[in-house]
Amino acid sequence: MDTISIRKFLYGIGAVEDLQGEVLIVNGKPIVSELDKNRNPVWTETWDRKLIFLVSAPVQNWKKIKIDRPVANRKEFEAIVFEYAQKEGLDVENGFPFRVKLIVKEIQAHIAYLRPETAQNFSPHGKKADDFPIDLENEPVRIIGFAGKTAGGRFAMPAMPGREASSLHMHFISLDFSRSGHVEDLKIEAIWQLCYRIKTSELLLTRKSYLGKNAI
């Protein structure tokens, strides 16, 4: 990750090498979420990590949209993100970044972790059992995400037996930057703010794959 040369205004999400953690970049500031040897979560501000993949984009200015609609789950959230992205004329096929400011009713998240034996016989069930769960309630957070109808296998979960490809990948960050993780599901009851990149030029959406396997 330390090879990234353009960091100013950069937003990105990705996974640490061998699925040993998550990475989030917020306005040029990296937060790495990992587990220590005792499976306790550790959050570090550093560029010194090897990654499996990273999707990123420089965003200097955001358009803020007030959303007064409750969200019961990830599916409803995703529908709203795409609805407003289309209204803004964004590239909903190839992908776009978004940012959310909110007080969540609930968030289910995780920090990626993969045991060697799980990696040898990889399955979604095995990975989920290895991941470190994070649950939040009634807490103000920020969410950085990337969405696109062709995101599955590019920068979101690919299609697997019994599960469709995902169109959205997002991480949360606490207001004090002390905690972060990959968002699995969420519930929103209060008014929230959805932000999109203001189109001043063509979007430079970068997706880097560093390894061939377990890329998401």
Enumerate the language-model features and the residues they cover.
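N-terminal low-complexity or amphipathic/hydrophobic leaders
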Residues: 1-56
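Extracellular structured ligand-interaction cores
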Residues: 20, 95, 165-169
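Short, glycine-/Ser/Thr-/acidic-enriched flexible segments
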Residues: 30, 105, 148, 177, ...
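Short helix/loop capping segments that flank catalytic or ligand/cofactor-binding pockets
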Residues: 33-34, 108-109, 180-182
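Contiguous hydrophobic, core-forming segments of folded domains
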Residues: 35-96
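Long, positively charged binding patches that form subdomain-scale interaction surfaces
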Residues: 71-155
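Exposed beta-sheet edge/beta-hairpin loop segments within beta-rich domains
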Residues: 154-164
